[in-house]
Amino acid sequence: MDLNLFRYRWDGDKYQLHYTVSQLAPYAAIRDWIRAGLDLHFRKDHRVLETIISIFFILGSLVSTLAGASTEYQAINCRKHSAVLTDFGGVGDGKTSNTKAFKAAIAELSQYASDGGAQLIVPPGRWLTGSFNLSSHFTLFLHKDAVLLASQDEAEWPAFPPLPSYGVGRDEHAGRFSSLIFGTHLTDVVVTGNNGTIDGQGAVWWDKFHQKKLKLTRPYLIEFLYSDQVQISNLTLINSPSWNVHPTYCSNVLIQWLTILAPVDSPNTDGINPDSSSNVRIEDSFVVSGDDCIAVKSGWDEYGIKFGRPTQHLVIRRFTCISPDSATIALGSEMSGGIQDVRAEDITALGTQSGVRIKTAVGRGAYVKDIFVRRMTLKTMKYAFWMTGSYGSHPDTGYDPKALPEIKRISYKDIVAENVTYSARLEGIENDPFTGICISNVNISLTQKPMELQWNCTDIQGVSSKVTPQPCSALPEKSIECPFPEDRLPIDDVKLQTCSASG
């Protein structure tokens, strides 16, 4: 597949997304690339497949080309000092390990943190590397023809203990491998480019997962812990071993202009997972994934309850998802630190299992509340709405069966869904109902063979207005418009600077 299909162009004062007729040639390649996975779900219904692929042309905002070899980029801060990976012995032949070169470069450049900061430029080439850690007041910049290739040698991936809010590793309880691009306790860190590529070469990890040969939990592509002022932007991420982007215990996080691609049958290749983080903005991005395109998290059962750090003040806008077995935006299921004040708007999903899905269970505790969604366009979906109070497993037997999650004030409005099998599956918890659900101005058109029961509702309470098909009796019709906050969050006011990676 020609990854140049997905490009953003700097137009002087902001990124714009473009495509031209000459770029339609990759259409067949993309179609074939996705078909292998989608055919498993759509029974070789190429009419459905063509509808899904039409996203690349219907939404010009997702198909573009960066102008030439421009070295300008947008960042939260520019850097006074600059170096190129080849200055530290980097070899971009796709075979030579560059882990030592990355570590040497970052160690050298980190000394400028208090003197205007530094940037490391990754030039054109194929740069094989294992895990490496970034530093504060630092920018990693990938040239448009640069490809970072994640090493498949486990020796290049240090072992870490489990995250404290999870208690155990997700794949294997013993712990986890470090992420490819990693950092902890950082301030002002940027990973960007003019749409360079990070290739996780995940197939070997997916095979180990399926064959139960993993000793530790698989690595992620980009992960920051306990960090503030984080930017991840204008990159293409492909074939991650597991999750792609994972800001955890972070604040003031800006994620934008990402293209994330993985086979739709690849295990746990979530796109963007904000985890126990606050003041986060995700926008102008596109994900094809084997799992949730965005999964909002905050810790697992008793470990998340004890750690007690919520994900809150999260903005998601202008986001597109393809994921046949998962959600466009998932809340949970690991939500034991709480999730509050999520604002999602202008969301598109094609060939995806569900729009916004709330996932929780007895033992999770905490809350999911003040969730606001508006202006969603959904095509070829199993569910338009899905909430479940019986999702997922527990890390161990130490969870508290009396720890019931509180799910309330959930607002959906201005949604159009086409070719839908079930309108809604809304399942709360016995003696712990999900309350304050509001659904308004929603039009759902059904597949040719819809399920007879369109609204399956148990242990929920709420209202609806102008919804087709008619909702269940637990959502009685009222003359209301569901709320959506009109105030701005601090992350909305973050201004970007025009920087140079001329090296």
Describe the role of every protein-language-model region.
Residues 2-13, 18, 26-503:
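Extracellular/periplasmic carbohydrate-active domains that bind, remodel
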